[in-house]
């Protein structure tokens, strides 16, 4: 055995001492340099591994079946590599199989590459998911959730593409037409007289205006009568009594800007986009990286019919909840039932969220929104919060007193000390500077509270 050298395996029968042969199953294209070696060395190596001792019994061990059925079994059981080569021989009563892998087909290389890429992607996604911050935007309808989300796009430099700008343009035109139609209807129901003669024809024309699929030429045709109506004292008086009916807060902004909106080259500005109103239906997500951490904002509709969809977003991946309240709506009722106070509705929803065991350990950030509109109402001598909340003890025309009253009303719903701390901010969602300052504070709070979970250094 000591003098036997295995230099090349071919399909030819190769004679070795003791009439043992190497046969079958080995192709001619095997590189002789790759497979060069001494059979004695291979067998001695195996004896060392299994703890066998050399001796007469070992010396008589047969080496027949050097290429045996073991190769075929291995080929059938696990090998999909058509160019793999197997060399098997018997030593110490055991079958030793050597697998020599010479090359792979292009298909196999492509499969292995794809598999590695998938593994890398999954690992990266797993790492990103662990690090992401997921924020739920909750609150009653028209509380400013979608406006806050628009601000996140603007603040973080995510541009509105052309198709989206066209969509906002159409929504803005609809806001103007429907807003004027609501004011015309309210003027009649409230028995408010026209401020000047000759407005009946303009009113008639406005009521017949089509809101859907408005383009610039059509809106330019509608703009003159709408502008004349908005200048009428009767329509202005109806708008001042808007708490008595349902109308969007932004109608006055667009009616004041109607001449600019009715130009041939009109493109919505950021301010226009922030003021336009379209009810959110379903669930909408927006992701932006903040300090290399993915912040995922989830916006869901706040109307009663949409709140059943909130539960889809309640899972263990939620980092914080931002709850928005329209603080100026203490004198308004819901559009859904025309009797429930809007501020009370928001407080009841907040109560449900804060005391829900699902959110134990999750920070809750309360945005008392629409501070600008609250200031207008509080400073108006014709409005008094005590008409709606008789137990209010402060100055009804002090913005600070009214804000503190509303804040305590919401903070008082917390029934368990085990609930996470509630943070609060007074906000104006249409004010980019205000939201930027507030979000920086919120961001720092969230990152600090979740330092370990986010694996930051």
From Swiss-Prot:
Q: Where is the region G1 motif?
A: 134-147
Q: Which GO terms describe its biological process?
A: actin-mediated cell contraction; adenylate cyclase-modulating G protein-coupled receptor signaling pathway; apical constriction involved in gastrulation; convergent extension involved in gastrulation; establishment or maintenance of cytoskeleton polarity involved in gastrulation; G protein-coupled receptor signaling pathway; gastrulation involving germ band extension; mesectoderm development
Q: Where does Mg(2+) bind?
A: 146, 280
Domain of life (superkingdom) = Eukaryota
Keywords annotated in UniProt: Cytoplasm, Developmental protein, Gastrulation, GTP-binding, Magnesium, Metal-binding, Nucleotide-binding, Transducer
Q: Name one GO molecular function term.
A: GTPase activity
The residues that hold GTP are 139-146, 274-280, 299-303, 369-372, 429
A GO CC annotation given for this chain = heterotrimeric G-protein complex
| Subunit composition and interactions | G proteins are composed of 3 units; alpha, beta and gamma. The alpha chain contains the guanine nucleotide binding site.
Protein's recorded name: Guanine nucleotide-binding protein subunit alpha homolog
